Amino acid sequence: MGMRMMFTLFLLVVLTTTVVSYPSDSASDGRDDEAKDERSDMYELKRNGRCCHPACGKHFNCGR
C-alpha cells in the first residue's frame, strides 16, 4: 500500500469511530445519574463514620 492509501484508510477509521461513538454519548446520561447516586451514597456513608470506597476507606471503617 502506498502512503496516500494508508493515510486515507487512517482517516476513514478515525471518522468512522468518531461517528459511531458520538450518538452513544446521549445514552450515557442515565449511567451518569447512577454514578452520581453512588457518589452520594459514598458521602452518606462517610458522614456516618464508615466508608468502603477506596477513596475514603483508609480513613474510616468499612462497617462490614
From Swiss-Prot:
<dbReference type="GO" id="GO:0030550">
    <property type="term" value="F:acetylcholine receptor inhibitor activity"/>
</dbReference>
<keyword id="KW-0800">Toxin</keyword>
<feature type="modified residue" description="Cysteine amide">
    <location>
        <position position="62"/>
    </location>
</feature>
<keyword id="KW-0872">Ion channel impairing toxin</keyword>
<keyword id="KW-0008">Acetylcholine receptor inhibiting toxin</keyword>
<feature type="propeptide">
    <location>
        <begin position="22"/>
        <end position="47"/>
    </location>
</feature>
<dbReference type="Pfam" id="PF07365">
    <property type="entry name" value="Toxin_8"/>
</dbReference>
<keyword id="KW-0964">Secreted</keyword>
<feature type="disulfide bond">
    <location>
        <begin position="52"/>
        <end position="62"/>
    </location>
</feature>
<dbReference type="GO" id="GO:0099106">
    <property type="term" value="F:ion channel regulator activity"/>
</dbReference>
<keyword id="KW-0732">Signal</keyword>
<protein>
    <recommendedName>
        <fullName>Alpha-conotoxin-like Ac1.1a</fullName>
    </recommendedName>
</protein>
<keyword id="KW-0629">Postsynaptic neurotoxin</keyword>
<feature type="disulfide bond">
    <location>
        <begin position="51"/>
        <end position="56"/>
    </location>
</feature>
<keyword id="KW-0165">Cleavage on pair of basic residues</keyword>
<dbReference type="GO" id="GO:0035792">
    <property type="term" value="C:host cell postsynaptic membrane"/>
</dbReference>
<keyword id="KW-1015">Disulfide bond</keyword>
<feature type="signal peptide">
    <location>
        <begin position="1"/>
        <end position="21"/>
    </location>
</feature>
<comment type="function">
    <text>Alpha-conotoxins act on postsynaptic membranes, they bind to the nicotinic acetylcholine receptors (nAChR) and thus inhibit them.</text>
</comment>
<dbReference type="GO" id="GO:0090729">
    <property type="term" value="F:toxin activity"/>
</dbReference>
<comment type="similarity">
    <text>Belongs to the conotoxin A superfamily.</text>
</comment>
<keyword id="KW-0027">Amidation</keyword>
<dbReference type="InterPro" id="IPR009958">
    <property type="entry name" value="Conotoxin_a-typ"/>
</dbReference>
<keyword id="KW-0528">Neurotoxin</keyword>
<dbReference type="GO" id="GO:0005576">
    <property type="term" value="C:extracellular region"/>
</dbReference>
